[in-house]
Amino acid sequence: MSSPEGSSVTFRRAPATLRRPAIERFARRLQKEVADGAPFDTLITGDAELRRLNRDFRKKDYATDVLSFPSGGPGLGDLAISLGRARAQAREFGHTIEQEISILMLHGVLHLLGHDHEVDRGRMASLEKRWRAKLGLPTGLIERVQS
């Protein structure tokens, strides 16, 4: 549930080298610029927890990189991001783990705003690409799948 003062990031599993303040600042920036001020909360955790959440809520028994849980009330909702998936994808695509977490967070926020790239004929992909460029992020999730 989103905190009253704004978006928050909880690091359940994170190495000491992870630049937490940068990720927290990015969450606040997303809240302000992309979500029109609506707060959301992000949990950064391990593959096992993402697998459990994916299985419990989507009936898909595998770890995924990001899950979105709309709130239906005040605030946008919650995101869960796999640190393991983020680390692997950052390595694969040649950028930092903080950039990958930011890409995943943007993708998740767009889902919280009601966009669904699986059915919207490219609308979410277009939004993600536009926001990614504006926010200075490397290639986004949808673009990777489409290329």
UniProtKB/Swiss-Prot annotation:
Disulphide bond pairs: none
Pfam name, any one: YbeY
Cofactor binding note from Swiss-Prot or TrEMBL: Binds 1 zinc ion.
Protein location: Cytoplasm
HAMAP family given in the database record: Endoribonucl_YbeY
Cofactor(s) of this protein: Zn(2+)
GO terms (BP aspect): rRNA processing
Protein name per the record: Endoribonuclease YbeY
Main location, first listed in the record: cytoplasm
GO MF, one annotated term: zinc ion binding
Species this protein is from: Solibacter usitatus (strain Ellin6076)
Gene: ybeY
GO CC entries: cytoplasm
Function: Single strand-specific metallo-endoribonuclease involved in late-stage 70S ribosome quality control and in maturation of the 3' terminus of the 16S rRNA.
Its EC number(s): 3.1.-.-
Keyword tags: Cytoplasm, Endonuclease, Hydrolase, Metal-binding, Nuclease, Ribosome biogenesis, rRNA processing, Zinc
Amino acids binding Zn(2+): 107, 111, 117
Keyword Metal-binding: yes
Recorded family membership: Belongs to the endoribonuclease YbeY family.
